[in-house]
């Protein structure tokens, strides 16, 4: 075979798309599609049609460029099997490892609190509106739900991991089906309210502020950062030895791009379908009630006057049940991450990494009591979920997803080739705008 034929053959082999690439594309997509998606239509539709159209333009760049930046950081380590903690320690020493451990824990723990509030509110609105039962004490409901989940976690963690993996695709399918099912109920209210002569760019309800706050919920909803490290390790072990690191980086970027396109298509279609069914005023009402959009849709169909169709009745009950299942799924997934992160912090600082000095069973019990106790306090206090996302969840995710990779690109020699690129400015800007939400919420 000639040299030219060898090159062509090699390029053809390199350009092939493997089954494992499809698996990871769907895996990244499935990781991002969780209960957080149920709040995106509320924030996106809060300001009406023009802000959500601008968010549509920003959605793919935010999802793709931010996750690609994190993947590049994970790829920069010398050990193909090294995770993100090892890579950060390689670049910045033990201090960097401590920082990444803290970031991971505090990126996940507030999400658990958010889901604690959400599942309490979702169950209570389902109990009162769909089942027509008398109102229950909030503290009791939150305690009952958390104890139920603690019981399941304690005695059936392995089973729950399997169940969660099976629930990903039915949940995504149900979102698409609900989006399609809402089409007969679409109305022109959101279009009728567009008045180009009275559009305000600035101010509390201006387009710029609405889109700015929307960026936070996009960072929160379009987030598969917890699985990026495992994804990169898998691809490096599969491709790097045979094709080199540059090809592996391109392959990772290609997979992240396809996963981002799938994610944006499903979530934005769901958001637009909800907005055309409801109205900006309804979205504001959902925010005030502190419930996910599926619960609000269920109540919306419950309040329809006259004889309801079987279709509307199915939507009323189906939306609530899907919301509950989605939140349970997300809660269990984030609980396992929070438990691992808290145990890691205790081991690192309390026992200096020596696992022989502590019983893991005892450590898991203490961590569970702290996690469930703090979640119950937050669930009972019932802070506004969107405010909690914008002030805590999204900024911490942005620190890990956007700013940490950008800092590494400036400081780490192995990432020097990525310096001076325009997409770095975009990722940095998204990270800073998300973190600045904290200042906006304070003042």
From Swiss-Prot:
Keywords, comma-separated and alphabetical: Amino-acid transport, Cell inner membrane, Cell membrane, Membrane, Symport, Transmembrane, Transmembrane helix, Transport
Catalytically driven reaction(s): L-threonine(in) + H(+)(in) = L-threonine(out) + H(+)(out); L-serine(in) + H(+)(in) = L-serine(out) + H(+)(out)
Any one of the GO CC terms: plasma membrane
Annotated compartments: Cell inner membrane
Membrane topology note: Multi-pass membrane protein
Superkingdom in the source lineage: Bacteria
MF GO annotations: L-serine transmembrane transporter activity; symporter activity; threonine efflux transmembrane transporter activity
Keyword Cell membrane among UniProt keywords: yes
Transmembrane segments: 22-42, 44-64, 97-117, 140-160, 163-183, 207-227, 259-279, 319-339, 366-386, 389-409, 423-443
InterPro entries linked to this entry: Amino_acid_transport_2 (IPR018227), Hydroxy_aa_transpt (IPR004694), Thr/Ser_transpt_TdcC (IPR023726)
Entry-linked HAMAP family: Thr_Ser_transp_TdcC (MF_01583)
Similarity annotation: Belongs to the amino acid/polyamine transporter 2 family. SdaC/TdcC subfamily.
Role noted for this protein: Involved in the import of threonine and serine into the cell, with the concomitant import of a proton (symport system).
Protein name: Threonine/serine transporter TdcC
Gene: tdcC
């Amino acid at each position: 075979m000639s040299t030219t034929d060898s090159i062509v053959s090699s390029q053809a082999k390199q350009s092939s798309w493997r089954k494992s690439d499809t698996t990871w594309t769907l895996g990244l997509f499935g990781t991002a599609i969780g209960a957080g998606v149920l709040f995106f239509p509320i924030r996106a539709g809060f300001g009406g049609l023009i802000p959500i159209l601008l968010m549509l333009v920003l959605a793919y760049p935010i999802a793709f460029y931010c996750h690609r930046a994190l993947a590049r950081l994970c790829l920069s380590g010398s050990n193909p099997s090294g995770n993100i903690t090892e890579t950060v320690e390689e670049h910045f020493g033990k201090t960097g490892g401590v920082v990444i451990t803290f970031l991971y824990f505090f990126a996940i723990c507030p999400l658990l609190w958010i889901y604690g509030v959400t599942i309490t509110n979702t169950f209570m609105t389902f109990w009162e509106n769909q089942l027509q039962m008398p109102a229950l004490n909030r503290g009791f409901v939150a305690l009952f739900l958390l104890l139920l989940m603690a019981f399941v976690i304690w005695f059936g963690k392995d089973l729950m991991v399997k169940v969660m993996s099976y629930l990903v695709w039915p949940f995504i399918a149900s979102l698409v089906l609900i989006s399609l099912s809402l089409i007969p109920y679409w109305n022109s209210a959101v279009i009728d309210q567009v008045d180009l002569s009275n559009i305000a760019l600035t101010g509390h309800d201006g387009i710029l502020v609405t889109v700015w706050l929307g960026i936070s919920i996009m960072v929160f909803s379009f987030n598969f950062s917890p699985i990026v490290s495992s994804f990169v390790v898998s691809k490096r072990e599969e491709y790097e030895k045979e094709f080199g690191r540059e090809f592996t980086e391109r392959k990772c970027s290609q997979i992240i791009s396809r996963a981002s396109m799938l994610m944006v298509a499903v979530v934005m279609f769901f958001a637009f379908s909800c907005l055309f069914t409801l109205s900006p005023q309804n979205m504001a009402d959902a925010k005030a009630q502190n419930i996910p959009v599926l619960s609000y849709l269920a109540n919306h169909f419950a309040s329809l006057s006259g004889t309801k169709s079987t279709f509307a009745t199915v939507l009323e009950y189906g939306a609530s049940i899907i919301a509950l299942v989605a939140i349970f799924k997300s809660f269990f997934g984030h609980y396992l991450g929070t438990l691992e992160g808290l145990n890691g912090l205790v081991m690192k600082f309390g026992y200096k990494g020596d696992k022989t000095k502590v019983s893991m069973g005892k450590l898991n019990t203490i961590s569970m009591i702290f996690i469930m106790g703090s979640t119950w306090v937050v669930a009972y206090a019932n802070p506004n979920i969107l405010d909690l996302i914008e002030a805590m969840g999204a900024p911490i995710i942005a620190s890990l997803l956007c700013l940490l990779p950008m800092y590494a690109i400036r400081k780490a020699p192995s990432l020097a080739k990525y310096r001076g690129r325009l997409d770095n400015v975009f990722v940095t800007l998204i990270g800073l705008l998300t973190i600045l939400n904290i200042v906006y919420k304070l003042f």
